[in-house]
From Swiss-Prot:
Family annotation (HAMAP family): BioD
Cofactor: Mg(2+)
GO molecular function terms noted in the UniProt entry: ATP binding; dethiobiotin synthase activity; magnesium ion binding
Name recorded for this polypeptide: ATP-dependent dethiobiotin synthetase BioD
Residues given in the record as ATP binding sites: 11-16, 40, 127-130, 188-189, 215-217
Active site (catalytic residues): K31
Binding site for Mg(2+): T15, D40, E127
Subunit structure as annotated in this protein's UniProt entry: Homodimer.
Catalysed reactions listed for this entry: (7R,8S)-7,8-diammoniononanoate + CO2 + ATP = (4R,5S)-dethiobiotin + ADP + phosphate + 3 H(+)
Keyword RNA-binding: no
Length: 249
């Protein structure tokens, strides 16, 4: 099962937070729509060692998805985007390969690693492109429609800077209008000047939980991301949400 990571804007830190969750919980990663190449998937996979599933739509230009698709002479059909299928393990090929504490191999091809991982752990972090109202098609289909199509709960990544309150409350309203479940907010400290009142205002006026405040990192590396502890309450929430989701299938 899966959770969806969206943000209040582009470059708000969705990939960093996705990487953080994958590192601490050992979940796989899936970015169904990518613009600007496969840099996000490559970063998460190389940083965490978990499988990064191939994007369904990937475009070379780092611009809005519907524009990138048009420039590439194609279009985005969200009905073609499904949660990755679970395949059989190739455990006979990896028994002698070093593993991490999550049972994931450190040195293994992406295909083989993904198949092994799926047997042990089928939980996935899905990362969106841009914010929830970014257009995907010229017919008006937006990222929020993809989230609704996948039927997965959402975590919103917000900035800690000026303007975050408005952007976050607008994002919440867009999701709530579609009756999409929001697990909570992660505040990403994108600079050293952290505005503490943002968190309080978002929690109060958005009637939602601040799951975590991610600190400003001067260097973004595996070690620096892993050094940011994930609270037990957030871990428990994510695990219980997916267990509950599984029980309904």
């Amino acid at each position: 099962m899966a959770i969806f990571i969206t943000g209040t804007d582009t470059n708000v830190g969705k990939t960093i937070i996705s990487t953080w969750i994958c590192l601490h919980l050992g979940w796989g990663y899936f970015k169904p729509i990518q613009t600007g190449g496969n840099s996000d998937s490559d970063f998460v996979s190389s940083t965490t060692g978990v499988p990064a599933y191939d994007s369904v739509f990937s475009f070379p230009d780092p611009i809005a998805p519907h524009v990138a698709a048009k420039m590439s002479g194609s279009s985005i059909d969200i009905l073609k985007i499904q949660l990755p299928e679970y395949r059989k393990s190739l455990s006979n090929k990896i028994n002698s390969i070093p593993t991490t504490e999550h049972g994931r191999s450190k040195f293994i091809s992406a295909t083989t690693q993904t198949k092994y991982w799926e047997k042990e752990n089928n939980k996935i972090v899905i990362e969106g492109a841009g914010g929830v109202l970014v257009p995907l098609q010229e017919n008006g289909t937006k990222m929020v429609d993809l989230i609704q199509h996948l039927n997965v709960p959402v975590i919103i990544v917000s900035r800690s800077t000026l303007g975050a309150i408005n952007h976050t409350l607008l994002t919440l309203e867009a999701l709530q209008a579609r009756e999409i479940k929001v697990l909570g907010i992660v505040i990403n400290s994108m600079c050293e000047d952290f505005l503490d009142y943002n968190s309080k205002a978002i929690a109060e006026y958005g009637s939602t939980e601040i799951l975590a405040t991610f600190p400003y990192l001067k260097e973004v590396t595996r070690d620096s991301i892993l050094s940011v502890q994930m609270g037990d309450s957030m871990k428990a929430l994510l695990e219980s949400t997916l267990k509950c989701k599984n029980s309904l299938l």
